[in-house]
């Protein structure tokens, strides 16, 4: 019969599929010797004649494959549909991959095999390179093989035939693993779809698929026991998409380590001797000229001894009270725990040309555009008492200095920490003067209760927590004696403590800068006064105190009790602790005149002390030159008390609007132990941030009230010009005010042309409103008063 190469290949495949290894070799030998029959006859093997399944398989393989209408091969008779699908996918995928196109049918690999992982995936599905069952995949992927030979292509292990008693077809036992040979270079190529195929030139490169079941280690060696040749390391892609080899990455890492060590060796290690908490002036970090430190006194062995010696030299220089050139504030050392704003303020020194210029700091606020003057007591602690007085004079002269329009240059001046030597105001009066009557408001109500300062101190102590207390504020009390409806008393010991400060000694109502000449401090009508505020806070309705005064309910309230929805019922109440914009002034009516103000702040502590001073007030001050514009924009009623001069609160939106209109302002936060000075014509508003006890008073500066000196100069000039002696007459100038009515007499010499009283105050009337004058003779006057009896009369 006729025999072709294709028939021989199919016979080999059939024998290899169903027979064991030994029987497959024998069948191949018989086929080579001519023992095979034609394509339309059955081949019966002697050893396998009893197995019907084997006969069916051999008959199906020996049958001539006829293509269908579409040009595809018909499925084999004895092959299951699953095997046919695998053969079709393998054939179509291989042909497409040969043409450079990926196969349309996806491989049968499980989804986890598409992602490269280092775990053992288990048995792999058949691929193009190494099929699990050696079948017709190899002839489809490779060109026609050479003439058949007896030597097999490679050591292959075929599944044994099923037992004679079994009737099922293709029931294979688990595959056995054979020893793998050496892996040649270029054995497998990486495809973009993670498929592997054998090389075209080497028929032995097609390794059976059971080699793929071996575990792989990280170093590329197989765990089968036989070491393989390591494949070249793949290039890894970095973040930028560039590929770099692993050895290059290791080299770069080593170079970086070497550079880092080299830099550490070059820099050297420097020990930190001081912590942040001790980096102060007293820690030995001050700068002293090198001429003072002699080389013989220094210990070159220890750096700590050097710093200790420097500290001792600083202390000696401080005791000697040397000049500011020899002992100055260090430039590089600042006090600890300073905020960024405070640090920037301390860096800006005001160049006054004096030796105290390093202690005066000027702040130009970028938002508001106004100027603020600052001084810090921790820097002034180096000064002697005499130098402190000289510095106070210079600082206050700058504070109240004015331009040609009689407007102050600075909106506010602050001496931070200047009141630290004073005791807590509330504790002082509660323990030393417990029966002093005070007027106390009820929190959130308009009722006023009169109690003692000791009882008020107890309520504050009971409700104080974290900077605020939930008791009513204490209204102002006078410290220089109560007049009419005022509350307070005269406390000379406390006033003496205030005068210990050089800043307060000059700016008290009877101070050296004041125009008043009082015989006793109790005659002052400008203060000081003291009051206590709890701080702005939100208070739940359950914590709101009830009013002690019962009032009759109206019919409207009784009707509202029928239905109160929870949405409309307030659950908490905002307690506003604010003083709206106002201008400090003295006098009423035509005697109204703006004046300066001084204040001292003491936070209510009750045992909660901290290194950093607590913020107590949030202040907004407008520039004195914009006084008229601010009065018009805010609609101020200057003749009202300070509490009711303005009806609206100036917030950030209003400030921004006024700033766009050219009005300058300064926003400052005042802290515990601060002393502040406000020049005249400066409109300001206060908001209490935390519980604070405040002192305040007005000061009538000599530069604001030059009336008495002008009157005396005019009197001397008139006495020199007048040559006639006539009976002396008394001119009584009566000034009427709302609070009091005082009379003042000026003794002058009568002349035929007596000058009117308005000429005596010609210079003062240019900037102040005219008071009401009454001229009477001395004979008709029933009462006589001297100028020294009432020196505090505003004129």
Swiss-Prot record:
Signal peptide: none annotated. It is an enzyme of class 1 (oxidoreductase). Residues 182-197 have a biased composition (Basic residues). GO terms for cellular component: nucleus. Fe cation binds at residues 582, 584, 684. Keywords: Chromatin regulator, Dioxygenase, Iron, Isopeptide bond, Metal-binding, Nucleus, Oxidoreductase, Phosphoprotein, Transcription, Transcription regulation, Ubl conjugation. Residues 784-795 have a biased composition (Polar residues). The modification Phosphoserine is found at residue 80. Residues 210-221, 232-248 have a biased composition (Basic and acidic residues). It is found in: Nucleus. Residues 122-150 have a biased composition (Pro residues). Its cofactor is Fe(2+). InterPro entries: RSBN1/Dpy-21. Binds 1 Fe(2+) ion per subunit. Phosphorylated by PKA. One of its GO terms (molecular function) is histone H4K20 demethylase activity. 2-oxoglutarate binds at residues 579, 676. There is a cross-link at residues 290, 313, 734, 774 (Glycyl lysine isopeptide (Lys-Gly) (interchain with G-Cter in SUMO2)). It comes from the Eukaryota. Testis. Expressed exclusively in haploid round spermatids. Residues 64-158, 178-248, 774-795 are annotated as: Disordered. A motif (Nuclear localization signal) lies at residues 252-263. Histone demethylase that specifically demethylates dimethylated 'Lys-20' of histone H4 (H4K20me2), thereby modulating chromosome architecture. Belongs to the round spermatid basic protein 1 family. This is Lysine-specific demethylase 9.
């Amino acid at each position: 019969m006729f025999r072709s190469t294709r028939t021989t290949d199919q016979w080999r495949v059939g024998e290899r599929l169903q027979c064991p290894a030994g029987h497959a070799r024998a069948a191949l030998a018989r086929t080579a010797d001519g023992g095979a029959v034609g394509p339309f006859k059955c081949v019966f093997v002697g050893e396998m004649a009893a197995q019907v399944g084997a006969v069916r398989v051999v008959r199906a393989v020996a049958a001539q494959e006829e293509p269908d209408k579409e040009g595809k091969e018909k499925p084999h008779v004895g092959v299951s549909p699953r095997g046919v699908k695998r053969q079709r996918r393998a054939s179509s995928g291989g042909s497409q991959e040969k043409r450079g196109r990926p196969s349309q049918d996806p491989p049968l690999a499980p989804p986890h095999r598409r992602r490269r992982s280092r775990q053992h995936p288990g048995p792999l599905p058949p691929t193009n390179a190494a099929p699990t069952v050696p079948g017709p995949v190899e002839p489809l992927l490779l060109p026609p093989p050479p003439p058949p030979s007896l030597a097999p292509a490679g050591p292959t292990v075929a599944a044994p035939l099923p037992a004679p008693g079994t009737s099922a077809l293709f029931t294979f036992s688990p595959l056995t693993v054979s020893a793998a040979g050496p892996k040649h270079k270029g054995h497998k190529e990486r495809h973009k779809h993670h498929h592997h195929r054998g090389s075209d030139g080497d028929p032995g490169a097609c390794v059976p698929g059971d080699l793929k079941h071996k575990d792989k280690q990280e170093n590329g060696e197989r765990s089968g026991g036989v070491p393989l040749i390591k494949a070249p390391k793949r290039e890894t892609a970095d973040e930028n998409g560039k590929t770099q080899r692993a050895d290059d990455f290791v080299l770069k890492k080593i170079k970086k380590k070497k550079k880092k060590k080299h830099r550490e060796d070059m820099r050297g290690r420097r020990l930190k001797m001081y912590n942040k908490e001790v980096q102060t002036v007293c820690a030995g970090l001050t700068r002293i000229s090198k001429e003072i430190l002699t080389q013989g006194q220094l210990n070159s062995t220890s750096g700590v001894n050097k710093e200790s010696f420097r500290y001792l030299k600083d202390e000696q220089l401080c005791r000697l009270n040397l000049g500011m050139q020899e002992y100055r504030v260090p430039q590089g050392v600042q006090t600890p725990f300073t905020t960024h704003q405070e640090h920037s303020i301390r860096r800006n020194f005001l160049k006054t040309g004096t030796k105290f210029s390093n202690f005066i700091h000027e702040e130009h606020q970028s938002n508001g555009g106004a100027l603020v003057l600052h001084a810090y007591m921790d820097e002034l602690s180096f000064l002697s008492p005499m130098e402190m007085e000289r510095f106070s004079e210079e600082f206050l002269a700058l504070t109240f200095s004015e331009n040609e329009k009689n407007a102050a240059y600075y909106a506010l001046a602050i001496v931070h920490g200047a009141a630290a030597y004073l005791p807590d105001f509330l504790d002082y009066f509660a323990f030393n003067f417990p029966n002093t009557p005070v007027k106390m408001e009820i929190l959130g109500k308009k009722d006023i209760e009169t109690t003692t300062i000791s009882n008020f101190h107890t309520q504050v102590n009971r409700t104080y927590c974290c900077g605020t207390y939930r008791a009513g504020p204490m209204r102002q009390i006078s410290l220089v004696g109560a007049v009419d409806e005022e509350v307070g008393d005269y406390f000379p010991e406390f006033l003496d403590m205030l005068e210990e400060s050089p800043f307060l000694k000059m700016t008290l109502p009877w101070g050296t800068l004041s125009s008043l000449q009082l015989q006793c401090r109790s005659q002052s009508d400008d203060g000081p006064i003291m009051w206590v505020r709890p701080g702005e806070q939100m208070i739940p309705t359950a914590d709101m105190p009830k009013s002690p005064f019962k009032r009759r309910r109206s019919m409207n309230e009784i009707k509202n009790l029928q239905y109160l929805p929870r949405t409309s019922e307030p659950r908490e109440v905002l307690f506003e602790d604010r003083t709206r914009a106002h201008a400090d002034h003295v006098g009423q009516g035509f005697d109204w005149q703006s004046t300066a103000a001084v204040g001292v702040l003491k936070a209510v502590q009750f045992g909660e002390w901290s290194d950093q001073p607590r913020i107590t007030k949030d202040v907004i001050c407008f520039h004195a030159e914009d006084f008229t514009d601010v009065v018009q924009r805010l609609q101020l009623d200057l003749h009202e008390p300070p509490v009711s001069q303005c009806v609206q609160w100036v917030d950030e939106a209003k400030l921004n609007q006024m700033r766009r209109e050219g009005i300058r302002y300064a926003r400052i936060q005042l802290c515990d132990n601060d002393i502040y000075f406000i020049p005249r014509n400066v409109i300001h508003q206060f908001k209490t941030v935390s519980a604070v006890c405040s002192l305040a008073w007005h000061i009538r500066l000599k530069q604001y009230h030059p009336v008495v000196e002008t009157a005396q100069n005019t009197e001397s000039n008139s006495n020199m010009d007048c040559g006639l002696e006539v009976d002396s007459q008394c001119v009584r100038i009566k000034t009427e005010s709302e609070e009091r009515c005082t009379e003042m007499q000026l003794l002058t010499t009568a002349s035929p042309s007596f000058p009117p009283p308005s000429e005596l105050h010609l210079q003062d009337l240019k900037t102040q409103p005219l008071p009401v004058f009454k001229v009477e003779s001395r004979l008709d006057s029933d009462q006589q008063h001297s100028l020294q009896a009432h020196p505090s009369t505003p004129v």
